[in-house]
Structure formats: C-alpha cells, structure tokens
C-alpha cells in the first residue's frame, strides 16, 4: 500500500490532553464521587459546618451545599459540571442542592460496575431513564395535597426543610418571617390558562417574585430576635432637606424616574454670551424650568416625592415650602417595591402626572435612625404586594448565614404556593422509591434490569447519609427502614387492592431513630423532591454519555 511506512499524522495540538472511552468515563465517575463526598456531611439536622477561605482572604462558614460548591475551586470538567448542576437546581427550586449532588454522585458510582464490564453507556442510560419514569409515578401516587393557608402545616414543612441550618435556634422566627414574606408578595397571575384542567387546584397560577419584591436589609447589631418583616418597604435614604417632615400618616406618594433639575443637553452644547443680561436670562430660564416642574407636582398635593434621579437645591426649596418630603437617587428596584406596596405608578414626565398615579396605600411614613444610618419606613400598607425583611445580628458572617437560611425557607414556601403537594421527608420518599423500583425491576428481563435496579440502590443514599450523620449504626437503621417499606408492599400485594402502599416511615435526622413522618410532621415540597430525582438521574445520564474529554491549551498572553 502507498501509505505504508508513513509516520503518524497529528491532528490535535501536541500539548492537548485527551482521554477517551472507559478511561474518560471512569475519570468522570471519580470526579463526581469527589464532589459528592465534599458535601455529604452537610445533609440533615446533624450536619457539619464547612469553613471556606475565598481568594480575597475572606472566611465563609456554612452548611449550605450550593454555597460550599460555589466557593470550591475545581479543575476537572465533570466536577465543574456538577457544581453548575447545583447552581441551576438552586435557581429552579431553591432547596435540595445537597441532596441532588449526593444522589447524582451515587447514581454514577452505581454505574461504575457496568462501565467496567463493558456494558454500553446507551443501555445504562436507557435503564436509568426507565427507572426515572417509574420513580416519578411512585411520587405522583404518594403525593399529599395541602391547603396553602393552613399555616401550621406549612410551618412544619418549612421546619423540616431548614432544621439543619445554622439558625435552627431561631427557627420559629425564620419560619414566621418566610411565611409572611411569601404570602405578602404572592398574587394570582393574570396569565390565562389554556390547560383543560383550568379549574383544577394545580392549574391556578400564582406569581411569587421573592427576588424582586422581598428585599432583605441586613443591619449589623441588635439580636436575631429583632428580625422582622415589614408590612411595607424601607430603604436606606434620608430626606433631601432638613426642614422636611419626617413622620406622615396616610401620605400621598408620588414616584418619578425623571430628574427634578435643569435638563442638560444630550450632546455637547456651546452658548455664546456677549453681555451680563444674556447670562441672567439663562439662569432665569433654568429657574423657571425647575419651578414649572415643581408647580406641576405641587398641584397634585403629594406628601412625599421620590425620584430615581437628582433633585436640585431650588426644587428642594419649593418642596420644603409646600411641606413636601422628597427623596432622590433611589434605586430602580426600591422604587418598584414602593410602587407595588403603596399603589403608586412611576411617572416619567411631570406634565403627564394623573391623580391615579398618586399612591395612597401607605398608612405611615417615618424616618428612623438605626445605628449610624437613617432609614425611611413605609408601613401599615393596606395590601402590600412587596415587603422588606429586616435582619439583625452580631456580625456580618452571622447575617449572611441567616440570609441564606431565610432565602431557603422562602423558596420552600414559594414551592408549596406554586404546587400545594407534599411528600414525607426523612428519607421516607427515597426508601419508598427504592423498594418500589426493586419490586418493578424483578419483572424486567435482559441487560436493562441491572441499571434499573442500580437507580433503586442509589436512592438509599439519602436515608443512609442521614443515619451516618446522626452517628447511629447505618447498616442496622437502613435495613430496618427497608424492611418496614418492603412489609408495606407485601401487605398491599396480599390485600390485592392495587394501590401504592403508603409507608411514611423515615429517619429522625436528630436522633437517628425510625419514626412515622406523618405523625412526626416532617414533609418536603413535591416539586423539590421530584426535581431533585429528575436532575440527579438526567445529569448522571449526561455524564455517562461522555466518552471523550479534550483539554485545549491556553494561548500565551491569556
């Protein structure tokens, strides 16, 4: 042949690192195992804290899985993918980040024997996806519908979700604040539903924008018991003039996003002045322009004027003379919250103000000094769809950790408002899915049975980790729990009623004992649990299908 004797042809750069086939797959599994092991001890009420040093020399002490992984610097691409998975899951449902990483890692660990025995990844993925559908069916049959306005049930749900957090001593305060904040900002969506079940409870769409309308204001000092949710909003601004009123009952509020000062030219402007009269004319025109704007505002008799832009000294003079309190350079986000809480409409031009734009929903405006800062409070609002959460604590580290925990609690309440269904916690759901998949897997034949059963085995990692973090005998506890769920299956099959057996037994994360989760009052949102299982299985399938990793070399100067 003509090509005999030719040297090897180099397609990739000689500096490029490449791993393929089984080597790449096993490397990915080991990387996923390492990431899961980092946060394994942070699951449950008996979780350990992690101390992390950021690149700037700051210290972060937390047991929040997403926060830990965000601070960890990794180099392996699969480890980076797992960390991105945690971040995406946190944005989607706001809770369960630790569980999803541990579960995804266990799915990949259980796939390792199949990879080593040269079973094709597509067959493993097919078995995993089949098991996922079966697991979701089990969760659907097991879900319990809850009334969102039953505050005691919702509180017990949030308690079980944030009981492991650093602020567990003040759980009652945190839960009450989360519940009040979410119910304050939630409102029915005006988007029409086109589903056939439009009248069903699950089809009711709620708009709960806690990121935009539930502002957390952290003020160092005081005690954690001083934390509160305002029935209105507050922001860190002082009035523009010392003679303006600092306390007003039932104020009329006008919101602007236009400057109350002479408008500057948008492009460079040159004016030639030949004598003093021209200069005086220019100054007079500026004063008249500002005066006209102020008179247009004063005509509507507002008590408070808030603008996102500047307020000139002359405008302050007119407002103080008219007994109007003014604020300037307020953030757009804060202005939107004030608008939503007081019923005001943000106006762009003073000559377009209408009576309907004035907000009258606020019951009390007051300036207060906390520490060395002045804060404007808009309280006692009639129907505030926005709120401010005031957090007090001894140090910034404590405040940051409390904020993370409160955010988790609000996400839990938000998820229940969106989908008012619950599943038992404490590893009960995972063990039920595990036993259910084992029973269903025995009916399968062929090579897919192994991967299908591997998903069932992987689901046990949650109750196993809970028992491990409690310091009890893991083998004895998990075996007893598995036996209880298996016995429920046997009873269901013997009775022949065809329904899915509801065994609510799980692990008490504090003592490590087996308890009935329904009596114990530990529940988790249906949407979080289902999304955790979906994300874990789908990410494991994605990583298993990677058979080639090519690492490009960086160019010089970059």
Swiss-Prot record:
The keyword Disulfide bond applies. The keyword DNA repair does not apply. It comes from the Eukaryota. It is found in: Cytoplasm. PROSITE patterns: TCP1_1 (PS00750), TCP1_2 (PS00751). It holds the Pfam family Cpn60_TCP1. Disulfide bonds join 381-387. GO terms for cellular component: chaperonin-containing T-complex. CDD domains: TCP1_gamma (cd03337). One of its GO terms (molecular function) is ATP hydrolysis activity. Keywords: ATP-binding, Chaperone, Cytoplasm, Disulfide bond, Nucleotide-binding. NCBIfam families: chap_CCT_gamma, thermosome_alpha, thermosome_beta. Belongs to the TCP-1 chaperonin family. Molecular chaperone; assists the folding of proteins upon ATP hydrolysis. Known to play a role, in vitro, in the folding of actin and tubulin. Heterooligomeric complex of about 850 to 900 kDa that forms two stacked rings, 12 to 16 nm in diameter. This is T-complex protein 1 subunit gamma.
